[in-house]
């Protein structure tokens, strides 16, 4: 019943483009082969960007979306800071006169920039009198000012793509990437993208999204909180069987969230892509050891669960959590799902997982809220 309701809500449809099993995304560039722990944070102010660069994380999600207020000044400064970071010249001075810069004795993280989503306009850039998409403004400015330097550094113009709802949006991004490489003289396939699967329509099209990105695909990310919001939004009028408990009571251990995570990992590893876990959104307090201990314990639980689920890496929100997350990743190697088994068995397993994506009835008892 649930899968039929999902199809009626237009979240499980899509083109039948994936009959062959023998396709894979290209091998990850060397800079993206180890993504065990990535730190997230804005690219402006410069001090926060420098903190991310000095965190010791494998990667830095330089966030122009959720972690950044989309004012024009903020966007421009973010791009400037990313340019200077690529050049190795990013520096800042506090009002008290303290200087900050990237430390040469610490591993420099690979920068993976997240532009705004397609739905957010940029009023300061008009195309034929119409506001441009903030996603294209952010991507275009970033690639124009950093791509060649990043490639010279042995990295590349790598991006996270947020809020996709369809493989058609991935197709559009692929066209944008190809156009950009052609017009800027960048090597084909040097622009790489990891797609956030944070809407229920995208959860039904993970294979299609990777297929559309083709040579520009790097992986998928499980954006659990946004995915849960998408479920609530899409099925808000679908009837009592689609009522979920208070959001704070629904964790990644809920059956429909487990199905989402498992299907993402299976899809990525079958296609040779990286499966990135979600945010460990707990922040330590250097002035309060008890708060810090609680945050580390929650991060430990998240990291262990994701490693056992087969995720290749995950995010943390604070530099003080990087070392603990790295240590846990070394302790618990990922249990990768097999990429080779009988097509019929795989199809049955994935139909069951797809059905479970919208099965809100199989939930433990929760306290009812007034």
What are these regions (language model features)?
Residues 56:
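Conserved functional loop/turn residues at catalytic and ligand-binding sites
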Residues 5-25, 29-30, 39-44, 48-53, ...:
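Conserved alpha/beta-domain cores
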């Amino acid at each position: 019943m649930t899968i039929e309701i999902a199809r009626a809500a237009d979240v499980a449809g899509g083109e039948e483009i994936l009959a062959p099993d023998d396709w894979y995304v290209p091998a990850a560039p060397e800079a993206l082969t180890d993504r065990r722990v990535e730190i997230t944070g804005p690219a402006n102010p410069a001090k926060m960007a420098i903190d991310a660069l000095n965190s010791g994380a494998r990667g830095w999600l330089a966030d122009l979306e959720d972690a950044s207020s989309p004012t024009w000044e903020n966007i421009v400064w973010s791009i400037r800071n990313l340019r200077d970071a690529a050049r190795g010249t990013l520096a800042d001075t506090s009002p008290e006169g303290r200087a900050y810069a990237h430390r040469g004795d610490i591993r420099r993280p690979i920068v993976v920039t997240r532009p705004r989503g397609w739905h957010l306009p940029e009023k300061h850039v008009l195309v034929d009198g119409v506001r441009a998409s903030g996603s294209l403004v952010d991507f275009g400015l970033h690639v124009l000012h950093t791509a060649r330097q990043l490639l010279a550094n042995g990295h590349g113009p790598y991006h996270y793509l947020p809020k996709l709802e369809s493989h058609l949006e991935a197709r559009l991004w692929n066209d944008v990437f190809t156009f950009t490489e052609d017009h800027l003289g960048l090597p084909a396939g040097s622009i790489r993208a990891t797609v956030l699967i944070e809407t229920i329509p995208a959860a039904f099209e993970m294979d299609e999204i990777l297929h559309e990105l083709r040579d520009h695909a790097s992986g998928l990310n499980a954006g659990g909180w946004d995915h849960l919001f998408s479920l609530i939004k899409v099925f808000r009028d679908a009837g009592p069987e689609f009522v979920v408990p208070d959001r704070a009571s629904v964790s990644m251990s809920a059956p429909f969230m487990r199905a989402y995570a498992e299907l993402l990992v299976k899809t990525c590893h079958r296609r040779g892509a990286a499966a990135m876990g979600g945010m460990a959104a707990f922040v330590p307090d250097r002035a309060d050891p008890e708060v810090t201990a609680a945050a580390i314990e929650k991060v430990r639980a998240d990291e262990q669960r994701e490693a056992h689920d087969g995720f290749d890496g995950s995010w943390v929100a604070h530099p003080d959590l990087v070392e603990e997350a790295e240590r846990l990743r070394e302790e618990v190697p990922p249990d990768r799902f097999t990429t080779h088994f009988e097509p019929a068995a795989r199809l049955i397993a994935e139909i069951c997982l797809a059905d479970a994506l919208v099965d809100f009835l199989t939930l433990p008892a929760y306290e009812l809220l007034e």
